């Protein structure tokens, strides 16, 4: 039998978009945290976060993830410069244009006092990006909704129960 914590997924990098949620609320200097980790003095730092809700919605070109070749090379237009929009898979060309790289293009970050408020802000931000050639973009509209959160909570409870009785 296996006892204790079980690894179900492991990265040696920041998970994306999961890390965007956490880093968006981080008040402590990330460089200071990194230096403390390297010097093995993380216990000397107080990690502080804003007490807010964050929802991140990833906007991707049609074709992702199965046909990344179709999702590549489309010129990107962002209607507004927004600090709540994080560029992901995009390439800057020599002429200054930005084209899709074939994966998640932009992450729209909604921050609010509640998850529904943050979700609404992120959803609105998805409308500021388009592809000039008319190629379709998509994103998951269910991210941050009450129904998805309820399903995820139930799955987490089930995973805990299975873990306890294995």
Regions found by a protein language model. Give the residues of each.
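Short, well-ordered beta-strand elements within core beta-sheets of diverse protein domains
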Residues: 58, 104-112
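Short, conserved charged micro-motifs
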Residues: 4, 65-68, 113-120
């Amino acid at each position: 039998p296996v006892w204790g914590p079980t690894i179900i997924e492991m990265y040696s990098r920041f998970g994306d978009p999961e890390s965007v949620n956490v880093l968006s609320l981080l008040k402590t200097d990330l460089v200071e945290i990194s230096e403390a980790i390297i010097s093995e003095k993380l216990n000397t730092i107080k990690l502080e976060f804003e007490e807010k809700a964050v929802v991140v919605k990833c906007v991707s070109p049609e074709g992702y993830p199965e046909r990344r070749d179709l999702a590549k090379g489309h010129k990107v237009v962002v209607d507004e410069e927004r600090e709540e929009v994080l560029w992901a898979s995009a390439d800057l060309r020599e002429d200054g244009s930005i084209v899709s790289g074939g994966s998640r293009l932009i992450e729209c970050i909604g921050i609010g006092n509640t998850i529904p408020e943050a979700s609404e802000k992120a959803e609105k931000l998805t409308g500021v990006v388009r592809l000039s050639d008319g190629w379709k973009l998509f994103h998951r509209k269910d991210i941050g909704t009450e129904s998805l959160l309820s399903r995820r909570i139930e799955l987490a409870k089930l995973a805990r129960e299975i873990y306890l009785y294995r």
